[in-house]
């Protein structure tokens, strides 16, 4: 990602809950100041040390809640403080449905299923995997971490 210094400075301070690159991209998109260039602007090599692992730090359902569901909810709510558009409203509804489903609130399963278009794979995973017994859930998480699922 490349950004004009003045624009980046105008978005300060960065919130602690959000990765800085994500926050900058979100704010620029909300301002209508983002574009995609097909041709590379810099030489860049992706390697294992600079990629975030899938389900890093998740070994049980409580970890999943804290690191996947709650982090997303915090991020969406933080974004909602600086912008408003339909996709963000969908993300907020999906996030609330994820929390309701995790806590097995009445209507949580149905609400999450209705919002599946926001992220189909995660929705299906949460609808079913979170209802598995803990040993099977842990096994499923290990398969996801290894790239099998």
Task: Show where each model-derived region lies.
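A structural signal for short, well-ordered beta-strand segments and their strand-loop junctions
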Residues: 2, 35-38
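Residues immediately flanking
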Residues: 5-6, 39, 46-48
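Structured helix-beta-strand junction loops
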Residues: 10, 14, 30-31
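C-terminal subregions of glycosyltransferases and related glycan-biosynthesis enzymes
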Residues: 17-18, 22-23, 30, 43-149
């Amino acid at each position: 990602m490349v950004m004009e210094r003045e624009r980046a400075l105008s978005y300060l301070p960065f919130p602690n809950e959000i990765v800085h690159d994500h926050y900058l991209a979100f704010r620029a998109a909300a301002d209508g100041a983002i574009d995609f260039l097909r041709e590379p602007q810099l030489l860049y090599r992706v390697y294992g040390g600079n990629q975030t692992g899938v389900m890093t730090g998740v070994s049980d359902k409580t970890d999943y809640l804290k690191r996947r569901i709650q982090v997303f909810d915090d991020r969406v709510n933080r974004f909602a403080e600086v912008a408003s558009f339909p996709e963000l409203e969908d993300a907020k509804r999906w996030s609330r449905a994820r929390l309701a489903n995790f806590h097995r609130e009445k209507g949580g399963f149905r609400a999450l299923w209705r919002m599946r278009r926001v992220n189909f794979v995660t929705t299906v995973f949460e609808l079913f995997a979170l209802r598995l017994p803990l040993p099977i859930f842990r096994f499923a998480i290990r398969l996801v971490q290894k790239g099998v699922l």
